[in-house]
């Protein structure tokens, strides 16, 4: 119909009419009442404005005559004007700073002015209605429907503007905090998914390493107790070696094929998960430093440079890793420990996984770490600790004795077997220094080989 509007002749009164807005809903009724009160005869003035139909369109004379009557109706220019306003309001950007007196050309605020100007110009030249009352009613209803449509479009625009304003305000107030929280949640979920498959295999390797140490007569004692500097250094060496082994095992995924890995990578990219290379670097560092999985500030900076992440992301990753990698390994080893003895980082040998001196990992500080109960050592001027490096524990040759060893209560003062536990091999009780109590002999007698074969 827009093409037909362009092909039509210019209607008198439509040229030069300001395209303002629209007014209230009662204007149409007022216009109709005003027009009915006119005494001017209904004539055929509208026939002068009829547009000739293109050839081939009106084979039926009746249809052609009806179209000509609609196009030549005095209210048809107003109908075309309202229709154009609806099109502009639908597909054109709104401009509140328009040059028209009533504001935006697509607005409904100046509808009264539009109607008044049109009625004034038309009344001076011809009547507002034709000789066909049915056609007059059709034109008025069509104008009202388009005007209601224009009002609804304006409501939609107002709702859109209100929603956009509130949405932008909400984003400005919450976006910084929400981004940090979402980043942490995403990294936590990614760490959990990445490490679920590796925890079980690492725990199995840990158990096999424990059995290997038991069979080969490792220098690590299965008896819970304090550790010396020499044993701590050996434990650190074993930790690094086993960490390398674990790093190699983690570097080669054991489950899934290449297609699954590609799909996982695509899914991780969509979720904003850390790159696989970055997680592998941090995992390798974690497994190589299981005895103390707490990187220093310099190490965090270096890891951040190596992985391309921020220091905060590296720090959060290690917090999650200590909770979701190290602790499940300890729990899994407790459930699958050999000989029915519960696995504990306080006493049982875990092949380099002991977190030395870490209070928040549930491990007691150096001293009598493996002593159960509420035993409190007697005051002494010398620090408590393991025997010096170089001593070999007196452990039964049987593998069960290697794992469990004698009860630590035997080393406590007052126990029936206390004297025999602190004597050297082949020595009798009278060889002890009489000036020292059994507790002093245990704590201060460093020159007594209590583990001699």
Swiss-Prot record:
Location of the DNA-binding region in this protein: 267-329
UniProt cross-references to Gene3D superfamilies, sorted A to Z: Homeodomain-like
**Superkingdom field:** Eukaryota
Question: Where would I find the MEIS N-terminal domain in this sequence?
Answer: 102-185
InterPro entries tied to this protein: HD, Homeodomain-like_sf, KN_HD, PKNOX/Meis_N, TALE_homeobox
Keywords on record: Activator, Developmental protein, Differentiation, DNA-binding, Homeobox, Neurogenesis, Nucleus, Transcription, Transcription regulation
Low complexity compositional bias, start-end = 218-230
The protein's job, in short, is: A caudalizing protein which is required to pattern the anterior/posterior (A/P) axis during central nervous system (CNS) formation. Inhibits anterior neural expression and acts as a transcriptional activator to induce posterior neural gene expression. Maintains a proper A/P balance required for hindbrain formation by activating the FGF/MAPK pathway, which modulates the planar cell polarity (PCP) pathway. Interacts with retinoid signaling during hindbrain patterning.
The record's similarity note reads: Belongs to the TALE/MEIS homeobox family.
What this protein is called in its record is Homeobox protein meis3
